[in-house]
Amino acid sequence: MPDRFVKNPVASIAARLKNEATALGLTPAQLQVMPLQMAYAHQGFLGRLDLSPHAERFVLKGGASLFARYRDLGRPTRDLDLAAQGPPATPEEVAGWIREICAQPFGDHLLFPPEEVQVRSVAPESAAHPVVNVRLTAHLGTSRQPVELDVSFGNVIHPGACLLEYPRLVIPEAVRLRAYPLEQVVAEKFAAMVELNVANTRMKDFHDLWQIARHDPPSPLPGESARGMPARELGEAMARSFQVRGTPLADLPFLLGEDFATDPAVTGNWARYRKKNAWARLPDFRDVMGVIRAFPGVVATTLPERMTGSWDPTALRWR
C-alpha cells in the first residue's frame, strides 16, 4: 500500500522491518549486532549516496559489502566503510560531501540532518591511506539511529569497482551502488594480516576470509564468478595491494605457519571474538587458519607468478 494511504507511515515501517528480518533469514543474535533499524539507516544513507552527485566518488567496502553479497551468511556490521576516489581530502571537505548526501531526498521517511554531521581524522592526509571518521544520525519519527562511516583514501581497486545491490528493506526497489570486487576484499584483508602479524586484533578479518572461502555469494554481482573465485584475478589483486601497502612478504611464512595459529595472544583474541559472535558457530583458530592457508595463502606464496584455476568452496581447495 502506498505510504500516502497509511495513517502512520513511521509505525508501518517499524512493523514491516520485523517481517524483512524473517525474509532475509537474520537470526535474533545477528540482529543484536546489527539491529534492523541500523540496517535501514545504512540503506537510507547509501540510497541517498546513489542519487547524489557523489555516487561516482565512493565505493563501498568492508563488512557492509559482504553483508550485501551474503545476506544472512554475512557478518553483521555496525558501520559503513567507503573508499573515496581521487586525492586525499581534508575532514572539512569530507564533511561537505556527506552533508550534501544527507540532504538528498530519498522517500524512506528518514531524515539525516546535515548539521549533525561530525568528522575527525583517524589517519592524517600524509599517511599512505588517510581515513576520516564520520558520525551522523538517522531520524525516523522520534527514534534516533547513530550511523558511523569510515572514509579512506589511496585505495587501489582491482579489477575495478562492481555494481552491488544492497538488501532491500521496505523500499520498493533495492539500492544499487559501486562496491569492492570480492578479490580486492580478500587481498586487502590478507595483506593486513601479514602486516599486523601477532599484533592483529582485527578478528573480524579472519572471520570474513573463513566465510568467503566456504561460500560462493548466493547472488554474484555482474562480472563475478558464480562458481569459485579465479586464482589469477586474486593473485593480481594481491600483488597490487601488497605493492601499494608495502606489505612485508618476509613475514608471510610465519603467518601461514603453526606458530602463528597457536600463538597465545592471537588465539586468546579469537576465543573472545568467537564467544561474542556465537551465532556464527566459528571453529577453533587453527581450523580457521587452515582454511586461510589453503585459500589466499596458496595464492600469495606463488607470487609473482600467477596461478590458474578457481577456488572450490565445497572442497576448500583450488582446482
Across the structure, where does each feature detected by a protein language model lie?
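Structured mid-to-C-terminal alpha-helical surface segments
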Residues: 1-58, 68-80, 84-319
